[in-house]
Amino acid sequence: MNPVLAQSSQPRGRSLWQDARARLLRNRAAVTAIALLSLISLLVIAAPWLSPHEFDAIDWDNISTPPSLANGHWFGTDAVGRDLFVRTLYGGRMSLMVGIIATGVSLLIGIAWGATAGYLGGRIDGIMMRIVDILYAMPFMFFVILLMVFFGRNIYLIFIAIGAINWLDMARIVRGQTLTLKNREFIEAAIACGVSTPRIILRHIVPNLAGVVAVYVTLTIPQVILVESFLSFLGLGVQEPDTSWGALVNEGAQDMESAPWSLLFPASFLATTLFCFNFIGDGLRDALDPRDR
C-alpha cells in the first residue's frame, strides 16, 4: 500500500479548542444564547441609526404614550415623553459597557494575584490568600455604595469599584489551576532553561488558563450587570441624561401601574441578556470539561 495514501487515510486528531468548539456548537441552548446576545449587541451599537429620536429628546405631544407604530415610538414613551425604544438600546450599551469593563478590571487583578500566589507558593501564597479571605468578609456592596455617596455617581468610578469587588473568586480559581500547572514538565523545562519567574507566569501559566478565564468572563459579566442595575435601582448608578437598564427598570417600576410598557421592555432586555450570558457560560464550561471529552 502506498505510504502516502496510508498516511492521508489516518484520522486527524483535534486540538482541545477544536473539540470544545464542536461541542459548544452542538449545545442548542448555548448557540441560541450566542445568537440572541449577538442580536442585542448589534441593536445597542446601531441604536443611533435605528430610530429618528434622540435618547434624551422630549416629545411634548406624546408623554407616557403606549407603544405605537403610528407615532414612531415603538416601545412607547416614558413619563417625560422620551422615546423608550432608543433609551432601552442606549441603556443596554451602558449596561454592557459596565459589565465588560468592570469584568476586565476584575480579570486583570484576579489573574495577576492568583497566578502569582499559586506559582510562588509557600509563605507568600499563604499571606496573599489570607488577604483574599479577609476581603471576602468585607461588605463590598456597602463599600461601593459609600464610594458613590462620597465621590458622586461617576461612571468611571462605577467601573473600577464594581471590578474591584469581583476579582476575589477569579484569584482563587487561578491559584488552584496554577498549583496544578506549575509541576508540569513544560514549566520544569522553562525553569531549567533559566527563564525568569515573571516570564514563566506570563508566557506559560496565563495562556493555559484561557479556558477557565473564558468561562469566568461569561459568568461574571451578568453578575456585574446585576450589581450596576441594583445600584441604579437605588439611584446610585448612572446619572441623567445617561441611562442603563437598571435605571430604566427603576423608572419603570415607579410608573408600572399607569405605564407598564416602561418596565416591560427594559426588564425584558435585561433578563434576556443575563440568561444569554449564563447559558453561554454553562455551554463553555461543559465544552471545556476534559471529563466529557
Each language-model region and where it sits:
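Residue-level signal for helical boundary/lining positions with a hydrophobic bias
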Residues: 23, 50, 74-77, 255, ...
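Transmembrane alpha-helical segments of polytopic membrane transport and secretion proteins
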Residues: 1-38, 280-293
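Short secondary-structure capping/turn micro-motifs that flank functional sites
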Residues: 40-41, 59, 206-207
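Short, strongly hydrophobic transmembrane alpha-helices
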Residues: 29-48, 111, 271
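Residue-level signature of catalytic and energy-coupling elements of molecular machines
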Residues: 24, 42, 134
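Short, membrane-interfacial amphipathic segments enriched in basic
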Residues: 2-20, 70-83, 120, 198-202, ...
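Alpha-helical transmembrane segments of integral membrane proteins
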Residues: 79-293
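Hydrophobic alpha-helical transmembrane segments of membrane transport/permease proteins
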Residues: 2, 35, 43-79, 234-242
